[in-house]
């Protein structure tokens, strides 16, 4: 059974900053309710899509609904790199820019490609 807005709401504290939603066994969680709850409480939503490659929620690909999608390509996952690996996705340019810099010791995209 997937996480739900109801189970999340019961666990929220004043220290909660984000919700990590795991789409289990290719079955997306009820994202409309979760996103509404996150908006109400000003929380980030991170989708763990490691078990849901290609899955859709109401026509939208998982990993594109929350603020960030996280994809593990570890050797025991659906899609692998033959070892350790992964990917993050976002529709937010500011988040993308920050995440991009993490992969290269803090260098910005502009510093690498627009000098």
Task: Describe the function of each predicted region.
Residues 52-58, 65-115:
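Active-site region of PLP-dependent enzymes
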